[in-house]
Amino acid sequence: MAQAGRTGYDNREIVMKYIHYKLSQRGYEWDVGDVDAAPLGAAPTPGIFSFQPESNPTPAVHRDMAARTSPLRPIVATTGPTLSPVPPVVHLTLRRAGDDFSRRYRRDFAEMSSQLHLTPFTARGRFATVVEELFRDGVNWGRIVAFFEFGGVMCVESVNREMSPLVDNIALWMTEYLNRHLHTWIQDNGGWDAFVELYGPTMQPLFDFSWLSLKALLSLALVGACITLGAYLGHK
């Protein structure tokens, strides 16, 4: 696999293809417009997304599902450091890790979806609260996988509740957080290539992600978000 060098891979591409995959699992098509990525450390420009749920959506976990929808155009940064194209194995390994995480806590993620109470006005607060709690005690690959899976849950829930435009914002928030808060850690720990080497198909299963701690963090963050919402509504 080609080495990305110090600048690393394009986080926006990684986010967009992951969300595309998670929506494809639920039978939604994701058409991505001509969107340029923002440089590292800057807020990216929102994309142009459209969602068309199939008449009879059938969940699927096949890795090639995303390829059946409209292809993603290459994402090239207009300014800032030149980013390397993301190798397919990075996307596949991240999907595998996310699927493993969601299988282990399928019931908890279902409960999380019902507790999010997403609206156009609460979505950013929900995202910020959970992500802040998730990385409060530091960063590791397990928490990064949980970050992607949580973003996927938010996107699916947004489409389920007929709030598809929220996915634009969620993709932007995820990319911005990766660029500003996680990119340095990822590069200092070998980049996404190291993630593939550690958790690729031929390596050990993803059993060292501190699943219970992640579950507790996500639950605590959701409780905090609900308390905050209750306090806000109490003053309305």
Swiss-Prot record:
Localization per Swiss-Prot or TrEMBL: Mitochondrion outer membrane; Nucleus membrane; Endoplasmic reticulum membrane; Cytoplasm
Key words, A-Z: Apoptosis, Autophagy, Cytoplasm, Endoplasmic reticulum, Membrane, Mitochondrion, Mitochondrion outer membrane, Nucleus, Phosphoprotein, Transmembrane, Transmembrane helix, Ubl conjugation
Motif range (BH1): 133-152
CC terms in the record's Gene Ontology section: endoplasmic reticulum membrane; mitochondrial outer membrane; nuclear membrane
Residues of the site described as Cleavage: D64, M65
SUPFAM superfamilies: Bcl-2 inhibitors of programmed cell death
GO MF annotation list: channel activity
Motif (BH2): 184-199
CDD domains linked: Bcl-2_like (cd06845)
Positions where Phosphoserine occurs in the chain: S70, S84
Placement of sequence motif BH4: 10-30
Positions where Phosphothreonine occurs in the chain: T69
Residue ranges of the TM segments: 209-230
One GO term (biological process): autophagy
Motif (BH3): 90-104
Post-translational changes noted in the entry: Phosphorylation/dephosphorylation on Ser-70 regulates anti-apoptotic activity. Growth factor-stimulated phosphorylation on Ser-70 by PKC is required for the anti-apoptosis activity and occurs during the G2/M phase of the cell cycle. In the absence of growth factors, BCL2 appears to be phosphorylated by other protein kinases such as ERKs and stress-activated kinases. Phosphorylated by MAPK8/JNK1 at Thr-69, Ser-70 and Ser-84, which stimulates starvation-induced autophagy. Dephosphorylated by protein phosphatase 2A (PP2A).
Membrane topology recorded in Swiss-Prot or TrEMBL: Single-pass membrane protein
Protein task: Suppresses apoptosis in a variety of cell systems including factor-dependent lymphohematopoietic and neural cells. Regulates cell death by controlling the mitochondrial membrane permeability. Appears to function in a feedback loop system with caspases. Inhibits caspase activity either by preventing the release of cytochrome c from the mitochondria and/or by binding to the apoptosis-activating factor (APAF-1). Also acts as an inhibitor of autophagy: interacts with BECN1 and AMBRA1 during non-starvation conditions and inhibits their autophagy function.
Domain notes from UniProt: The BH4 motif is required for anti-apoptotic activity and for interaction with RAF1 and EGLN3. BH1 and BH2 domains are required for the interaction with BAX and for anti-apoptotic activity.
Subunit structure: Forms homodimers, and heterodimers with BAX, BAD, BAK and Bcl-X(L). Heterodimerization with BAX requires intact BH1 and BH2 motifs, and is necessary for anti-apoptotic activity. Component of the complex, at least composed of LRPPRC, BECN1 and BCL2; the interactions prevent BECN1 from forming an autophagy-inducing complex with PIK3C3. Interacts with EI24. Also interacts with APAF1, BBC3, BCL2L1, BNIPL, MRPL41 and TP53BP2. Binding to FKBP8 seems to target BCL2 to the mitochondria and probably interferes with the binding of BCL2 to its targets. Interacts with BAG1 in an ATP-dependent manner.
UniProt family annotation: Belongs to the Bcl-2 family.
Name of the protein: Apoptosis regulator Bcl-2
Originating organism: Canis lupus familiaris
